[in-house]
Amino acid sequence: MSIPELGKKIKVTVPSTTANLGPGFDCLGAALDLYNEFIFTRIEGGGDRFDLIMESTDGNHLRGGPENLVFRAAQKVWESANMDPFALEARVKLAVPPARGLGSSATAIVAGLIGANAIMNSPLSKEKLLELAIDIEGHPDNVVPSLLGGLCLTARSSSQRWRIIRCDWHDSIKAVVAIPAIRLSTSAVSYTHLTLPTNC
């Protein structure tokens, strides 16, 4: 598989999500119509170069490095496709507030997977991208609706394969989001996965 030509661009728009709905701890989540936008460009340089430029809704510009989730997700695509890494730039317009429970980390993971895959002419299937997304995030409730849209229930089958059920979202149900003033990252609350029973 050849490395994409310099200057090739891919635009990816990923929705925010709400998860842990009702009894669906770690397995039931829904996409919301608030989006982060990612534009990936093949740039000069080796696979260790990843330029991430983020513009938040308040106009602030932030930069990220190779430790960023977008880059980590792109690396998973290269590894799975047996592809040598190449230099990428990602310009991100952030509308989803980070560390507020709206799946901002899931948008980064899904965008990195879709963007890296698409810029290489999609060697990996959507099913493989789903597996990679869940593996990176650690649980499916945010990344699955972020990738597929809608309301999704995700669980492992007896054969340990992921099974996804798309649920109807009734027109009478409206999402209302209250964004807290405090920031709380996914990693900061990961202890709940150790103290609560596994439902899915």
Describe each model-derived feature in a short phrase:
Residues 1-100, 114, 118, 122:
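ATP-binding N-lobe of GHMP and related small-molecule kinases
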Residues 11, 37, 151-153, 175-177:
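Conserved hydrophobic/aromatic beta-strand scaffold that supports enzyme active sites
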Residues 34, 179-184:
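Glycine-rich beta-alpha junction loops
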Residues 34, 102-124, 146-152, 157:
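DPxDG-like acidic metal-binding loop motif
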Residues 124-174:
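Alpha/beta catalytic cores of group-transfer enzymes, especially the acyltransferase/condensing modules
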Residues 188-190:
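Acidic, proline/serine/threonine- and glycine-rich low-complexity intrinsically disordered segments
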Residues 193-200:
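Single conserved hydrophobic/aromatic residue that forms the stacking wall/gate
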